[in-house]
């Protein structure tokens, strides 16, 4: 079996496709049932966030896995593989592990360094346990990914990169509405990202209003930042009174449509309105950007600004952590892969000793004391002969390409070992698009 990741994100797919692919907990269960019912998928978990939809699977065959997983995702989106093949990516084995670790650290997020993804990974881990897959391949991988993500946040200044998305939005806003202190900001949503936004805006001296579908959550966040809470029923009036609006909810449809914003702008014909849409699927209808007086920026625009900033230099330490952890994970897998070979070698040695001791007993009349001494001596000799090669093969197996040593040991001693891994052909690419992988099949 081998890890395979098939998915799409803000880096490969349009926002329209990402919106169609996004799903809730019920949708995730449907996708998981479809995946595990396919012939080439043993285990699976789903990662669906504001800027990615990814299926992580333990597969028995590369080509079959690509076909099965790609088919499930395409049916979910409602598009054919011929349309989506270039937007869907595939990673497997070490490349899949590296991708997951980068995701866990926030390196692959639109909001670089954001830590909300760790919560999504915990949900995926809980789902594996609820389906009775604790202790399995993906369970161990997810636990490692969570540890890597926590390590990245604790050992580096990664959290500053997450806040920089909000800083970038504020810089854009100042260019539209002027100096920010004393301005009114409307924050739509009350989740983790909304809390970061509201806190940052309040510290910058803005008047903060928090609007949310659940009044209690809006009230708690507003109280924490010294702001005011409101429900979504008053959204039109709050937009009309605001200088800037930042929306980041988990809603499936648009929270701010063209009609609502257009109506709000009528009450403020001489004042520009800045809107930052930090949600995916979009909270703000993209056509709002066409309204006179409205200045809309979304995740794509902010991400482009962030990528060119000095924050990118602060992420090198995190990338080094990821590289180190990927290497350690690969070494542990290779060491685990050689273990059955070592067990088989020792079992074969024990069998040879037992056969020869029976043969000796049938030919030579030994008393119990002598037979016991001979038996112990033979076992000590065998153990000493096997000790160095078994220790060395474990050490060598941890190095890249070390699996070849286990294969050599099996060949030299004619050992019968249940195949470990072997899901993927040697000429298959480590990463690429699903379109490339399908072409590779043909």
Curated annotation (Swiss-Prot):
Q: Which InterPro entries does the protein's record reference?
A: 4pyrrol_synth_GluRdtase, 4pyrrol_synth_GluRdtase_dimer, 4pyrrol_synth_GluRdtase_N, GluRdtase_CS, GluRdtase_dimer_dom_sf, GluRdtase_N_sf, NAD(P)-bd_dom_sf, Shikm_DH/Glu-tRNA_Rdtase
Q: Where is this site: Important for activity?
A: 99
Query: Which pathway does this chain act in?
Result: Porphyrin-containing compound metabolism; protoporphyrin-IX biosynthesis; 5-aminolevulinate from L-glutamyl-tRNA(Glu): step 1/2
The answer, when asked if DNA damage is one of the entry's keywords, is no
Alphabetized CDD domains for the sequence: NAD_bind_Glutamyl_tRNA_reduct (cd05213)
Q: What is its EC number?
A: 1.2.1.70
Task: Tell me what this protein is called.
Answer: Glutamyl-tRNA reductase
Query: What organism is this sequence from?
Result: Kineococcus radiotolerans (strain ATCC BAA-149 / DSM 14245 / SRS30216)
| Taxon lineage | Bacteria, Bacillati, Actinomycetota, Actinomycetes, Kineosporiales
What's the gene? Answer: hemA
């Amino acid at each position: 079996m081998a890890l395979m990741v098939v998915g799409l994100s803000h880096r490969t797919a349009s926002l329209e496709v990402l919106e169609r692919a996004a799903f809730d907990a019920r949708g995730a269960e449907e996708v998981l049932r479809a995946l595990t019912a396919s012939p080439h998928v043993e285990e699976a978990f789903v990662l669906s966030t504001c800027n990615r939809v990814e299926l992580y699977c333990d597969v028995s065959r590369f080509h079959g896995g690509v076909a099965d997983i790609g088919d499930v995702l395409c049916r979910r989106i409602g598009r054919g593989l011929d349309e989506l093949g270039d937007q869907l990516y595939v990673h497997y084995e070490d490349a899949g592990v590296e991708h997951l670790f980068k995701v866990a650290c926030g390196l692959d997020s639109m909001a670089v360094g954001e830590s909300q993804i760790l919560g999504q990974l915990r949900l995926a881990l809980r789902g594996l346990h609820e389906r009775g897959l604790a202790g399995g391949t993906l369970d161990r991988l997810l636990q490692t990914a969570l540890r890597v993500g926590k390590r990245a946040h604790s050992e580096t200044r990664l959290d500053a990169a997450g806040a920089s998305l909000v800083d970038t939005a504020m810089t854009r806003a100042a260019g539209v509405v002027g100096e920010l202190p004393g301005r009114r900001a409307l924050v739509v949503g009350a989740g983790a990202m909304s809390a970061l936004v509201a806190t940052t805006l309040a510290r910058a001296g803005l008047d903060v209003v928090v609007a949310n579908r659940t009044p209690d959550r809006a009230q708690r966040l507003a109280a924490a930042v010294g702001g005011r809470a409101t429900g979504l029923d008053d959204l039109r009036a709050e937009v009309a009174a605001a200088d800037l609006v930042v929306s980041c909810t988990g809603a499936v449809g648009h929270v701010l449509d063209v009609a609502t914003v257009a109506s709000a702008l009528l009450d403020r014909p001489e004042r520009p309105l800045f809107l930052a849409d930090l949600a995916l699927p979009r909270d703000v209808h993209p056509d709002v950007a066409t309204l006179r007086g409205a200045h809309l920026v979304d995740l794509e625009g902010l991400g482009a600004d962030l990528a060119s900033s000095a924050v990118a230099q602060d992420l090198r330490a995190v990338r080094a952590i990821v590289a180190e952890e990927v290497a350690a994970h690969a070494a542990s897998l290779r060491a685990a892969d050689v273990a059955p070979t070592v067990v088989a070698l020792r079992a074969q040695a024990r069998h040879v000793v037992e056969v020869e001791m029976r043969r000796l007993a049938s030919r030579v009349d030994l008393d119990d004391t002598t037979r016991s001494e001979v038996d112990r001596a033979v076992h000590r000799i065998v153990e000493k002969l096997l000790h160095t090669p078994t220790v060395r093969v474990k050490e060598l197996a941890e190095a890249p390409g070390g699996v070849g040593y286990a294969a050599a040991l099996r060949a030299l001693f004619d050992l019968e070992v249940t195949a470990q891994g072997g899901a993927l052909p040697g000429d298959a690419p480590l990463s690429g698009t699903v379109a490339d992988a399908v072409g590779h099949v043909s």
